[in-house]
Amino acid sequence: VELGSKVTGFNIDDEVWGCTSNANSGTHSEFVCIDVDEVTHKPNNINHLEAASLPYVALTTWSALIRWSGLRPNDLKGKKVFIQGGAGGVGCFSIQLFKNLGCEIATTCSKKNIELVQSLGANQVIDYNEDNFEDVLHNFDIAYDLLGDHVSHNSIDKCCKILSQSPDSHYITLTHPLVNTLDSKGLIM
């Protein structure tokens, strides 16, 4: 294991965590060469198993918000955010991140997970077995759809229905349109 000649703030024996960029795979390897901005010191209060899983959910959300949607943390304070599927790994992290950035959070989950998402900071929770979120929620600034149409029928339309009519509203999804095309039409070879 080596440090690059211009790397500062790290020592060879430091415990670190991070994630390579999409262009640089190899994280299933025993060793990988990684840019210094893709790694940081592992917090002392978590173990290596937790350190291996947290960056994935954190960077999934951060990448969707910052890199792909163009939102900036300072612009989110006071925004109304809907998270479709708040009880999963990415959803649980997203609730905490948006809450920490000063947002009002609404989310969906099953009845058994309501207390969990509330404890993470959700202001409003809709049990998806009891209510349709698109009938309850209105004028949201951001709809973060973690399920997409391949899991929840017409999810895109339902999420867009709850958005305010502002040009600053955002629909963010983790589902690439290609997934739905492959599901409906198959793989073209």
Regions of interest found by a model, annotated:
Residues 2-3, 8-189:
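Terminal helix/beta-alpha structural elements that buttress the NAD(P)+-binding lobe
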